[in-house]
């Protein structure tokens, strides 16, 4: 037993609807509604139509909230993207387009939109014939293998997906095709290639952002301080032990004299630079105390004698001067 027919097929009119039939159906539904029974509706109106035909005519054409006319570009993009993702589920696609019915979208897709998009794809394929021959061979091999593995609908959706990408980024073919890029002059190209290694060699930084030269200077300063502290501790132990005779280190004393001479020269340079800065900003009188203090320190340092009464004082003073010189050399770097 099958489903009972909704109407008598022998006495039902088929074919397109006339304007008079549209007016009768629309006026009756506006006044009385459908009543929830589409099978009995044609008899009440006096139409020789099937109840299903009346329902589809009302839902697809005669409803007041239906959009009539052509589709916009935004609607075309929505239909295309949804068709690529879910296929021909027209009712779901129609739910995303207010005022459009599933039947209207299906008819528009089959008659106009699909042909227009596939026609654009063929035209762009002709324009892309200037691409590399190897890329063309690969694309031809893929096109020859695709019908064996994909159905017609899946292949169509794949082609439309490529078309959608071309619509969203029309310059993608230019960016992905190095043949179309402008060529530089050979002299300019060689110049740019020669400059790149120089720039790379000049960047001598640690991967964590630490300067290698600065880190090397810190290592040298730490070594100088460690050596000075070890010498100072040895001299203190010798002074505290009266049984141990002190043996002067002539090489170390000569190094200290050389450091003393270098510090004298550096102090003179610092005082001259400070005096010049004071002249530029008209602050020579206000900064005279600073130059006098530096000059006094220079005289005190240069007049220090190595023939003092205590050998421990000489060694301690030498250690302090060595540490000060190491700090000044570090700051000058």
Swiss-Prot record:
GO terms for molecular function: DNA-binding transcription factor activity; transcription cis-regulatory region binding. The keyword DNA-binding applies. Transmembrane segments: none annotated. One of its GO terms (biological process) is regulation of root morphogenesis. It is found in: Nucleus. Induction: Directly up-regulated by SCARECROW (SCR), as part of the differentiation program controlled by SHORT-ROOT (SHR). Keywords: Activator, DNA-binding, Nucleus, Repeat, Repressor, Transcription, Transcription regulation. InterPro entries: Homeodomain-like_sf, Myb_dom, SANT/Myb. Disruption phenotype: In myb36-1, myb36-2 and myb36-4, impaired Casparian strips formation replaced by ectopic lignin-like material in the corners of endodermal cells, associated with reduced expression of several endodermis-specific genes and abnormal CASP1 localization in the plasma membrane. Multiple changes to leaf ionome, including elevated concentrations of sodium, magnesium, and zinc and decreased calcium, manganese, and iron. Longer root hairs. Delayed and defective barrier (Casparian strips) formation as well as extra cell divisions in the meristem in roots. Its main location: nucleus. GO terms for cellular component: Casparian strip; nucleus. Residues 119-150 are annotated as: Disordered. Residues 9-62, 63-117 form the HTH myb-type domain. Expressed in leaves, roots (endodermis-specific) and seedlings. Residues 136-150 have a biased composition (Low complexity). Residues 122-135 have a biased composition (Polar residues). SUPFAM superfamilies: Homeodomain-like. Disulfide bonds: none annotated. Transcription factors that activates genes required for endodermal differentiation but represses genes involved in proliferative divisions, thus regulating the transition from proliferation to differentiation in root endodermis. Required for Casparian strip formation by positively regulating the expression of the Casparian strip genes CASP1, PER64 and ESB1 and other endodermis-specific genes, thus triggering correct localized lignin biosynthesis in root endodermis and subsequently regulating global ion homeostasis. This is Transcription factor MYB36. The gene is MYB36.
């Amino acid at each position: 037993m099958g489903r009972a027919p909704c109407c008598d097929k022998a006495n039902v009119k088929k074919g397109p609807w006339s304007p008079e039939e549209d007016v009768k159906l629309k006026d009756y539904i506006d006044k009385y509604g459908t009543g929830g029974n589409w099978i009995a509706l044609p008899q009440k109106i006096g139409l020789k139509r099937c109840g299903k035909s009346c329902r589809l005519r009302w839902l697809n054409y005669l409803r007041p909230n239906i959009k009539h006319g052509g589709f916009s570009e935004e609607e075309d993009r929505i239909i295309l993207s949804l068709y690529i993702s879910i296929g021909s589920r027209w009712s779901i696609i129609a739910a995303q387009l207010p005022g459009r019915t599933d039947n209207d979208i299906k008819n528009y897709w089959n008659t106009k939109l699909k042909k227009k998009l596939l026609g654009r794809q063929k035209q762009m394929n002709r324009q892309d014939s200037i691409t590399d021959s190897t890329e063309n061979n690969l694309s031809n091999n893929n096109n020859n293998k695709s019908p064996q593995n994909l159905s017609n609908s899946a292949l169509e959706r794949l082609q439309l997906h490529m078309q959608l990408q071309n619509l969203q980024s029309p310059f993608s073919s230019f960016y992905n095709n190095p043949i179309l890029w402008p060529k530089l002059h050979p002299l300019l190209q060689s110049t740019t290639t020669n400059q790149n290694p120089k720039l790379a060699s000049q960047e001598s930084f640690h991967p964590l952002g630490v300067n290698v030269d600065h880190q090397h200077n810190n290592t040298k300063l730490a070594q100088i301080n460690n050596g000075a502290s070890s010498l100072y501790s040895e001299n203190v132990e010798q002074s505290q032990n009266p049984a141990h005779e002190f043996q002067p280190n002539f090489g170390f004393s000569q190094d200290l004299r050389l450091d003393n001479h270098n510090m004298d020269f550096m102090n003179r340079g610092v005082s001259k630079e400070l005096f010049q800065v004071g002249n530029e900003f008209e602050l020579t009188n206000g900064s005279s105390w600073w130059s006098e203090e530096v000059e006094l320190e220079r005289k005190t340092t240069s007049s220090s004698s190595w023939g003092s009464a205590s050998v421990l004082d000489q060694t301690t003073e030498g250690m302090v001067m060595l540490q000060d010189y190491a700090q000044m050399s570090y700051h000058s770097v």
